[in-house]
Structure formats: structure tokens, C-alpha cells
Amino acid sequence: MSEKKKTINAFMLIVLLFGLISLFTAYPLSNGDEGFHMAKSYSMFSETFPRETSEKRLREIELIAISQPKQISIRKFYGEKIKSVANDGIKFNVLTDQNLTSKIDVGHFFPAIGILIGRLIYPSYGVMLFSARLFNLIFFLGGMYLIFRRAKFDHLIFLMIFTVPFMQKIASPSYDIFAFLAVAAFGTNFLYLSQLKKVSDVRKE
């Protein structure tokens, strides 16, 4: 096994372990605007847009979840079935975001799939959030692995250090994961291109 592959595998293992710890131990809706991201993700595959999954309602629950002392019931959060969610149909909706150049929100796609699968398994806040976190973690790991494979060995340390500040977000439904992967991919290509003497040296891969 090459030195580069060993380095990649070791780092991915560390990220996986950190992500799994965060997945199971991070308090519900406490990982940076999770109420907002959960509401956006849910709406991507919703037919009736239940009030219980609206941004307003999830923000209210998030405020309770991050308050001191903690006032949210973990058992109820995971175990209580939401009737309106159980009765909701599945319809794909294109989400928009005026802050994006394309105006189309693609950053919530993977957590949206996670929430959809979560509500099909058991329509509770906890199960949906757990599934969304899991899918974003898988997306992050897969994306970073592909980026690392394409990167030169001397760029890996830079990318790994760059990853550290975002570690707390890798198991959350946030669109920050999508943005981070885009920036990491851009950084990898930029570092590669900056070392070329002429444009014709660009590898055709």
C-alpha cells in the first residue's frame, strides 16, 4: 500500500470515528441551526408541508434544546410519532435560495434524503434528525475520499488541516458540508494548476 493511500485511510478513519461520536452524542438540534436545516431538508420531499416540520416550529424546539438547563425530553423527541408527518405524502420540491448564484438549493439534498428515509422508518423528530445527520456524514466521507484520491501527496496535509474546523458539522443536516466539499475540490485543483508551468501541462483525466 502506498504512503498516500495509508495517509488517506488513516485520516478517513479518524473522521469516521469523530463523525460517529458526534452522530450519537450531539444533543438534538444543538449543532448550529439544525432546526432551520432540518425544516429545509424536510420540505424537499414533502407534499403537505406539516406545521410540525416548519422552520418556525423546529426553531422553537431548537431553542428549547439549546437552553440551560436542558428542557427537552429525549425519549419523546425520538419516540413520539408525528401524525402529520406519518400522513404526509412524498413529492419532490425544488428548493430555492436567493443568496445563491443558481438560486437553487442543492446543499440540502443529501440530508433531505436522510430525513425522507428516517420518516419512512419512523416519523419522529429524533429518527429523522439522526438519519439526516448520518446521510450528511456519509456524503462528507465519500466526497472527501474522492478529493483526497485526486490530490497530490504534498497537498494532503493542507486539505486535512483545512478539514479540522468543519469537523463539528460533519454529522449535521447543514448545507455547510456541501459548501466545504466544493471549496476543498476547488482548493485541490487550484494547488495543482498553480504548480504548472503552462496550460498545456494540464492532465486530461
Regions found by a protein language model. Name each.
Residues 1-5, 191-205:
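Membrane-interface junctions at the ends of membrane-embedded or membrane-associated helices
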Residues 1-22, 29:
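Start-transfer (signal-anchor) and selected internal transmembrane alpha helices
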Residues 46-131:
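Interfacial juxtamembrane loops and adjacent helix segments
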Residues 101, 105-109, 124-133, 140, ...:
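Aromatic- and kink-enriched transmembrane "portal" helix at the membrane-lumen/periplasm boundary
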Residues 115, 144-149, 183-196:
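Hydrophobic transmembrane alpha-helices
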Residues 130-153, 185:
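Transmembrane-helix motifs of polytopic, lipid-linked glycan transferases
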